Regions:
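Conserved non-cysteine loop/helix-boundary elements of the Radical SAM core domain that shape
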Residues: 1-2, 10-170
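A C-terminal junction/extension of Radical SAM enzymes
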Residues: 156-202
């Protein structure tokens, strides 16, 4: 508890990541209330979401408890690549509809590139579906095969990953998207989502 006259400590951001923290939405509100009573959060509150959990009801609850940024782990909008990653086929219509009804400062969507038989055209399609359906920020990370997991997925060579990343970068910049980091692009130059900062963050 803050004592009388004691100022709140200023931090840049508060992020809830890993897994599916939104499944504990009621407790999440309690945690945010407690933390904001001790800290002055200057650049917003973010949370990671699984696409199958994104509904209008959930987004409204997140907005009501003070969340300003969401990051949705899409990986791909295409079933053939979701299957490679061990994900079930996703029906994204509910998510798209919810994003049209509840607004956030940042709506980020995460993707994986350099999957078997994945082409630049596949990634181009994912990028445009994202930006056309509520996202104003995307992150595109290379697939990394951690040997101990025995995924059986044939990984791209480094030079192939670099070439694909260059195509992605050129495509995004040609369309006026702002490159925020090696893996991330924003639609309007202002949206951002990064759980790692150089400033104080929680």
């Amino acid at each position: 508890m803050l004592t009388e006259g004691q100022a709140k400590k200023e931090v840049s951001s508060l992020y809830f990541g890993g897994g599916t923290p939104a499944l504990a939405i009621d407790r999440l509100g309690e945690v945010i209330e407690l933390l904001t009573s001790h800290f002055e959060i200057t650049q917003g509150i973010g949370i990671e979401l699984h696409p199958s959990n994104v509904t209008e009801k959930l987004l409204q609850k997140l907005s009501d408890i003070g969340v300003t940024k969401i990051s949705i782990g899409i990986q791909s909008f295409q079933d053939k690549f979701l299957g490679i990653l061990g994900r079930k086929e996703n029906r994204f219509e509910t998510m798209f509809d919810a994003l049209q009804k509840v607004s956030f400062e940042t709506v980020a969507m995460d993707f994986i590139f350099a999957l078997p038989n994945q082409t630049f055209q596949d990634l181009q399609k994912d990028i445009e579906v994202a930006f056309s359906n509520g996202a104003n920020h995307i992150a595109i990370y290379p697939f990394i095969d951690f040997g101990f997991l025995e995924s059986g997925i044939q990984e791209f060579q480094k030079k192939e990953k670099r070439a694909l990343l260059k195509q992605i970068t050129d495509y995004c910049e040609e369309r006026g998207y702002t490159r925020d980091s090696i893996w991330t692009f924003s639609k309007d130059g202002r949206a951002s989502y990064s759980s790692m900062t150089r400033d104080n963050f929680l």
